Swiss-Prot record:
UniProt GO molecular function: rRNA binding; structural constituent of ribosome
NCBIfam families in UniProt: rpsS_bact
Protein name: Small ribosomal subunit protein uS19
Source organism per UniProt: Granulibacter bethesdensis (strain ATCC BAA-1260 / CGDNIH1)
SUPFAM superfamilies referenced in this protein's UniProt entry, alphabetically: Ribosomal protein S19
Keyword field: Ribonucleoprotein, Ribosomal protein, RNA-binding, rRNA-binding
Name of the gene: rpsS
Any single GO CC term annotated in Swiss-Prot or TrEMBL for this entry: small ribosomal subunit
The protein's role, per its UniProt record: Protein S19 forms a complex with S13 that binds strongly to the 16S ribosomal RNA.
Similarity section: Belongs to the universal ribosomal protein uS19 family.
Keyword ATP-binding: no
Domain of life (superkingdom): Bacteria
GO biological process, any: translation
PROSITE patterns per record: RIBOSOMAL_S19
Length: 92
């Protein structure tokens, strides 16, 4: 179920402070965040965030198409090793 409109998008407070500081400094450095649940806002466009996936920080360059989505959508937590090879085909 989607979040109700009257509540507005959820964003952790520290994330807004970090984004404002990055904009003020003018340097294009990666902003490390753990908040995968936060919504991407229009003011984050152009910034690069390092979104933690439980193992490492994956760099996410925010574009206009990402606005309204969550940071966690762009940092997968599971790796798919592929299906097992067919042992009968290898043997003969």
């Amino acid at each position: 179920m989607a979040r109700s409109v009257w509540k507005g998008p959820f964003v952790d407070g520290y994330l807004l402070n970090k984004a404002d500081a990055a904009r003020a400094s003018g340097r294009n450095e990666i902003i490390k965040i753990w908040s995968r649940r936060s919504t991407i806002l229009p003011q984050f466009v152009g910034l690069t965030f390092g979104v933690y996936n439980g193992h490492k920080f994956l760099p996410v360059q925010v574009t206009e198409n990402m606005v309204g989505h969550k940071f966690g959508e762009f940092s997968p937590t599971r790796t798919f090793p592929g299906h097992a090879a067919d042992k009968k085909a290898k043997r003969g």
